[in-house]
A protein has these predicted regions:
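N-terminal accessory beta-strand-rich subdomains and adjacent acidic, glycine-rich linkers
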Residues: 11-275
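Bacterial Sec-dependent N-terminal signal peptides
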Residues: 1-10
Length: 276
């Protein structure tokens, strides 16, 4: 296991060397990442972090350490595209503290980089006597290169459709459209597919969500930059919350990014790799 807390940018590479993630802490103490496939940016520098009621973990951070190790798993599932899966990846855990309290770690960002997928999630650490917190916003972003087009399912507004259950049903997909829109004003439902130059593709989704966290969507900020969005306030007739109340320590669901040629998109098993 390697530990290199002093570096400002670190690279995490897949076992076959084709996929790489570059982790950075930029001006203002903001954690960011990039994703490369065969040396080309498929996700440009994008934000990371969480906002909670016990602290803003999107800025003002210092890096305490990063560790890397190889991980592997073999599992079988019925009725999916591949009956026996051999999963291999490089795992990196970056630990951060607030700049004004550098002695106390507050959050880990955990990355898994396999031969066709990148996945990341957050772990909010215990804060002295604090045992619970509310996650109010996730800063996780996905900045896609210029010229990218999209294949997306717009999320409908709440309290419409059959028995007023929207957005529980799929809406018509838009195909090969330029990026820069926000669907019908409420973003997009996962999974979200994007096409780039040189026949490269990116599929963004989530996995590992359970009843202890909110299901999320993808919002467009501007141009080719998207970010994770929490539920709309009117969903389920207003019952439930648009934020996540969690017991500490807490790990969030995985954000997944499948990259490369279209075959990688079709063959990915990342939704099961991380939850088997």
């Amino acid at each position: 296991m390697l530990s290199f807390a002093t570096a400002q940018a670190q690279t995490v590479t897949s076992p076959n060397g084709k996929v790489a993630v570059i982790l950075e802490l930029v001006e203002g103490g903001q954690p960011c990442y990039r994703v490369l496939y065969e040396g080309q940016d498929v996700v440009e520098r994008s934000a990371l972090g969480l906002k909670t009621n016990i602290g803003d973990f999107t800025q003002g951070l210092v890096l305490k350490e990063i560790t890397q190790k190889a991980v592997s798993d073999t599992y079988q599932l019925r009725n999916i595209k591949q009956s026996c899966v051999d999963y291999e990846a490089t795992e990196a855990v970056a630990t951060y503290a607030l700049r004004d309290k550098p002695e106390m770690p507050v959050m880990d960002i955990i990355f898994r980089v396999s031969d066709r997928d990148v996945a990341f999630r957050y772990k909010i650490l215990l804060q002295k006597e604090t045992r619970v917190c509310v996650v109010t916003e996730e800063a996780s972003g996905f900045a896609l290169p210029e010229g990218t087009t999209s294949f997306l399912c717009p999320q409908s507004k709440p309290m419409g459709g059959f028995a007023r259950t929207s957005p529980s049903y799929e809406t018509p997909y838009t195909c090969d459209e330029p990026v820069g829109k926000n669907g019908w004003g409420e973003g997009y439902t996962f999974p979200c597919l994007f096409k780039m130059a040189q026949d490269q593709w990116v599929l963004i989704s989530e996995t590992g969500t359970d009843g202890g966290y909110v299901g999320c969507r993808l919002l467009n900020e501007q141009g080719g930059t998207y970010r994770i969005g929490f539920p709309q306030a009117g969903e389920l007739n207003g019952a439930g919350a648009t934020s996540a109340a969690v017991a500490l320590p807490c790990e969030t669901p995985w954000r997944t990014i499948t990259v490369g040629p279209l075959a990688n998109i079709v063959e990915t098993t990342v939704a099961f790799d991380l939850t088997s």
